[in-house]
Amino acid sequence: MPYRSTEILSPGPADKAPLHRVTLTHDQRHLRRKLLHLENDDVVMLDLKEAVMLADGDLLALEGGGYIEVKAAEEALYEIRPRDRLHLIELAWHLGNRHLAAAIDEGRILIVRDPVIRAMLEGLGATVNEAVEPFHPLRGAYHGTGHHHHGHGHDPHHG
């Protein structure tokens, strides 16, 4: 019989020891209702009221007690290295303008591999290398608002 969870603890408190673990890619961590396969071959039915973006270390609270830990899976990524800080800002702008998920650090940006985007970045002078590691992109400005649309000139006060 599968476990069932209707609640997320984010971030997972250090004093809550998980019973099991589920490892998911970035795309797989965006969910509302799904049967998840745990590392020990058990399953948990996640049944939330609304869609969430799970993060590495979150805990799924199980009905009847106990927790399942969410781990970020290693993914095939591009590691983008800029010439300097100003170049990092420019590259981040181009990625954001294309609505791409990106993990931005002081000296690098990580994105999911896409050869077209790689060519664009290299054309902008970036060094792009393949990497395999967990992907923790920044949450966007519209994260948690319950929708994914945004205004592009729809406000009559902004031309």
From Swiss-Prot:
Which SMART domains did the record assign? UreE_N
Which biological process, per GO, is one annotated for this protein? protein folding
UniProt GO MF annotations: nickel cation binding; unfolded protein binding
Localization recorded for this chain is: Cytoplasm
Sorted alphabetically, the keyword list is:
Chaperone, Cytoplasm, Nickel
Record bears the keyword Coiled coil: no
What Pfam families is this protein classified in? UreE_C (PF05194), UreE_N (PF02814)
One GO CC term, this protein: cytoplasm
Query: Which parts of the sequence are annotated with region: Disordered?
Result: 140-159
HAMAP family per UniProt: UreE
Describe the task this protein carries out.
Involved in urease metallocenter assembly. Binds nickel. Probably functions as a nickel donor during metallocenter assembly.
> Member of which family?
Belongs to the UreE family.
Q: What is this protein called?
A: Urease accessory protein UreE
Species of origin reads Sinorhizobium fredii (strain NBRC 101917 / NGR234)
Higher taxonomy? Bacteria, Pseudomonadati, Pseudomonadota, Alphaproteobacteria, Hyphomicrobiales
What gene is behind this protein? ureE
